[in-house]
Amino acid sequence: MSGKNLRFYVALYMSKLARTALRVLKRNASYFPGKLAIKICPDFLGRINKPETIITVTGTNGKTTVCNMILDALEANGYDVLNNKAGSNINAGVASSLVAESTMSGKCRKKIAIFEIDERSSKLIYPYIKPTYAVCTNLFRDSIHRNANPEFIFNIINSSLPESSHMILNADDLISCNLGAANDKTYFAIDRLATDKEESVNLINDVRICPKCHKPLHYNYVRYHHIGNAKCEFCGYESPKADYLGKLDMDNQILNVVTPSGTEEYHMVSNSIFNTYNQLTAITVLRKLGLSYEAVKKSFADLNIVE
């Protein structure tokens, strides 16, 4: 959607006025200005100008950490990045971020943005925000009253995603790796670990049958829950091949990443497998954005995450 009508300009001016008032009062202006803009102009997100390059990050776990890693690395390399780090990850928060960095005519001041996106808000955001790169970290069960089953969230995201977006997905997650059948994709994964099991030992595993033919799915190995590597012995469905494959050297705290251009060595920011996935996600995004191996490596050299 394009074009700025009178309703849009009223929404923009009122939201900027609200933002100024909140800041004068030393209040958080990361939610209400956007909420007001969308209340006045329901398709506000579709009409306001956006940066040339947009990265969105959604998923059950790790999206905030991944966003912060990407943002820190980009800023360390001289990028001026629009983001919603300070506030809400729903549509009003994204709108507030765009209002804050727009001129009075609705023109965006920045050329690149990274937005953390709440999974359930995908249907309110993706129809208007067309990300260059759409990242999904993983999909797991969450609080039952909010997100219910991961398939429910999968369907919300999958039905909302623009086909033009290049997806960056976890090949080890047998739910989220199936997002965006028509989209271009880049996959990341972590190679088999000594601690992986031959079969699931968790009480919860939401992928026990093949998502294609619905017959029993064979796991080559299971890391936890439905994270692992699998192949269907009936229809041939299998875990996607990783474009960025992490090989962990836990003794020396090194993350070796096998990429399309060769193997790269990074300092592991954490002993936790969860944060190693987060780091690998960020590395994949940054390399796809065009940052050099040396620049990305330097960004993680002195970073440590407190467990």
Place the predicted regions along the sequence by residue.
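A short glycine/serine-rich beta->alpha loop
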Residues: 80-85, 265-273
